[in-house]
Amino acid sequence: MFAFSLLTALMISSEPVPLGWGGSDFVQYYAAQQLILEGKNPYDRQAAEALQIQLGRSGGVAMFAPPWSLLPSRPLVRLRIEEATRLNIVMNGLLLVLITAAWQAMFFPDRLSLLPLLLASLLLWYPSLAVLGMGQLSLWPLAGFTGWLYARQQGWNLAGAVLLVLLVI
């Protein structure tokens, strides 16, 4: 956890880079949040696309995600796009680690020695790299479903609450 925190601090404090890895999808959510802060409609296609281009995207794309899907990007909107993109990568990376650990605990509880191998394989598995590289929010519903399964397996009474909170996102 210390190494993860140190990596996060280094990523945030390093020099900004143009919109690139981790920002192609995330910039849509970030631009939508910016429009909301300005009191504008995040689904105004012209305004959203113009802002996305201004933020570094080569071309704008329409925002089709439902409003509640913007919640994970909400805390990042006050940061510069470069910092917000980096933190989004860190948040998605942390979600991947937690999801992997939960699935490993559910299906291989007697083989904890597999966890380092599973975590290392995340860096080589294309879907993991794609989610991190685009800045998608698709890990949030997976985290909700995984949390619900894990909570049910543990016999927690609030398993449905975990699912509800994260699936709404």
Regions found by a protein language model. Name each.
Residues 103-124, 142, 159:
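Transmembrane-helix signature of polytopic, membrane-embedded enzymes
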Residues 5, 121-128:
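Aromatic-anchored segments of alpha-helical transmembrane domains
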Residues 138, 145-159:
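Membrane-interface transmembrane helices that cradle and orient dolichyl/undecaprenyl
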Residues 130-138:
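Short acidic/glycine- and proline-prone juxtamembrane loop motifs at membrane-interface regions
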Residues 96, 137-146, 168:
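Hydrophobic core segments of transmembrane alpha-helices in multi-pass, intramembrane catalytic enzymes
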Residues 2-107:
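TM-lumen/periplasm interface segments of multi-pass membrane proteins
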Residues 158-169:
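Membrane-interface alpha helices of multi-pass inner-membrane proteins
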